Amino acid sequence: MSYIEKQEFLAELKTRNILKDISSPEKFFNLKPDQGIYIGFDPTATSLHLGNYISISLLKRLQKIGIKVLAVIGGATGMIGDPSFSSKERKLLDFKTLNANKEKIKKQLESFGLPVFDNFEIYKNMNILDFLRDVGKNINISYLLAKESVASRIEVGLSFTEFSYQLIQGWDFKFLAENYRIIGQAGGSDQWGNMVTGLDFIKKSNLDQKDEAFVFTTNLLTDENGQKFGKSLGKPIWLDPEMYSPFHLYQFLLNQSDEQAEKIMLWLSFLDLKVINELIFKHKKDKKQRILQYNLAKQVVFDIHGDKGLEIAKKITKILFEKLDYTKITFNDKLELKKIIPYFKVSFFNANQIIDLGIFKSKRELNEFISHKALEINGSKISNISDITEELKDKSNLFLLRKGKKYFFMIELI
């Protein structure tokens, strides 16, 4: 890739509002074909989330233009926990949990076509004395304490374990530069301090490429309130389809505001900027059609879950919100629905049973919905409470209940 092409690539990252800071654009422009860039992912859960996907998509963008990339899974750093801009100490994971997380996230990253390296390989044979002599000797404690990411935690308390995190992440960079010619590191904007520590380790080394290393950060994926998409706020949008279905991701993206949809489209989609601008123009001409949101949902769900995941998401959306003819709902569709809407198994089915299940608070409420023609079972409008019988079951012994416009329930007769 030529110098000019790299300039154009960086300019596009700025236009998409992906790029936050870069230590040296010139060093990125002069990146050699055998040199590469990495991003780290700590295995603190069984799945990565949408906040991580901006980093995954960045590696894919770099890969697409011919730059060597590496996804580094934090088998070592995950044991410690990154304190950067965190308000409290992170809970340490036991080895069994960490290793299970590691395996799942490794498969997840590989599913996006990314090569993966586990940083535990760097430290598994290093003892504490080696670490203090080789790593600790090369860094000044006052330099570390001055970092904003550390200073923000000093007053509330910072353990030596978490304090050491930036040393390990920094040493990762030096090791990868020395052994794999990985001289660039990217990450979220909250990682700047840790990444610059790695630059310092490299500058103090005897590497022939020590003056070529650089780091750059991306803006964090945030909601309308400026809160980052992640798991720490308690509402993670997992990339694992078993933990957060393609349908739920599709709906999440469909329900974004115009401003937020435009922002996420630029961040996460691989559509050309010209195409995105055309979609924005069409959307503004008739906002009720939600052209931007539909295209955003389509692009991101396809990129994360593939064609099958997108088709499932679109089909379930039709079933639940566009009143698809019940006869066109397949058995596989029903299996997917069971994962998405409240699902119950019962040995008998009648009006009292659906009240006992909590679908209706009382017989009075049930009758109110029936009188307003607001209860459907397997596509049939219920006009009388006595119509709620097992005769309504389908061939799979299933009942799909629609309560009003928004609430759905699946009941299986066993």
Swiss-Prot record:
MF terms from GO for this chain are: ATP binding; RNA binding; tyrosine-tRNA ligase activity
Q: Which GO terms describe its biological process?
A: tyrosyl-tRNA aminoacylation
'HIGH' region (motif): residue ranges: 43-52
- Residues binding ATP are 231
Where is it localised? Cytoplasm
Instruction: Give residue numbers for sequence motif 'KMSKS' region.
Output: 228-232
- Known InterPro entries for this protein? aa-tRNA-synth_Ic (IPR002305), Rossmann-like_a/b/a_fold (IPR014729), S4_RNA-bd_sf (IPR036986), SYY-like_C (IPR054608), Tyr-tRNA-ligase (IPR002307), Tyr-tRNA-ligase_bac-type (IPR024088), Tyr-tRNA-ligase_bac_1 (IPR024107)
Keywords, in A-Z order: Aminoacyl-tRNA synthetase, ATP-binding, Cytoplasm, Ligase, Nucleotide-binding, Protein biosynthesis, RNA-binding
Instruction: Tell me the ranges covered by the S4 RNA-binding domain, including all copies.
Output: 349-414
Q: What is catalyzed by this enzyme?
A: tRNA(Tyr) + L-tyrosine + ATP = L-tyrosyl-tRNA(Tyr) + AMP + diphosphate + H(+)
Major subcellular site: cytoplasm
- Fetch the SUPFAM superfamilies from UniProt: Alpha-L RNA-binding motif, Nucleotidylyl transferase
Signal peptide annotation:
none
Q: How does it assemble?
A: Homodimer.
**Similarity section:** Belongs to the class-I aminoacyl-tRNA synthetase family. TyrS type 1 subfamily.
What is the documented function of this protein?
Catalyzes the attachment of tyrosine to tRNA(Tyr) in a two-step reaction: tyrosine is first activated by ATP to form Tyr-AMP and then transferred to the acceptor end of tRNA(Tyr).
- The entry's protein name is Tyrosine--tRNA ligase
